[in-house]
Amino acid sequence: MRLVFASNNAHKLEEVRAILGKQTQILSLREVTFEEEINETGETLEENSLLKAQTVWKYLFQQTNIGNAQAIDGVFADDTGLEIQALGGKPGVHTARWAADEGFYPNGETQTSGNNRALALHSLQGLTNRNAQFRTVVTYIQSNGRMQQLEGIVKGSIANEEKGIGGFGYDPIFIPEGYDKTFAELPAELKNGISHRARAMKALSEWLV
């Protein structure tokens, strides 16, 4: 099966390819010559995930004939949010650009991930409730236009400080439920088996069967 993942994020591509396994060939946007910037204007994870999948699907199967020419079976996109209980579910849909939206640049304007993590730790100072969850919404659109949305959630808590050098994004401050280490401290194979994205992709792989 050949699927296009609506992303050029190298970390996400590596993770998704590891999760879905060798039986599914995952193509990046670059590999199908998609160069358009997709503005994530949705107000929910579901809306953003759908927006990305629809934009790429239309490009492959309506605006061009690339989808049919390359025997592509479908397109999928994901949107992930960190939802911190004590902050009313923030940053949620704004997870990737939270610090920039808040004008919070302790590490300089170019250090997006570092600033996001710093803002999470700063916002929870003095609070005992550090419960949080990562939620990933995946939208899959078949070559014939049939659409399905699936979800993966991993509950956990926000650490008191950054720990670990693996992973990306908020991984150094997120401790998954049942573990005493952050995602960034866990082996990649373990993280890929229990993460929110892994659970969403597992749901997708089961639906595809």
Regions found by a protein language model. Name each.
Residues 2-4, 10-209:
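Anionic-ligand binding patches
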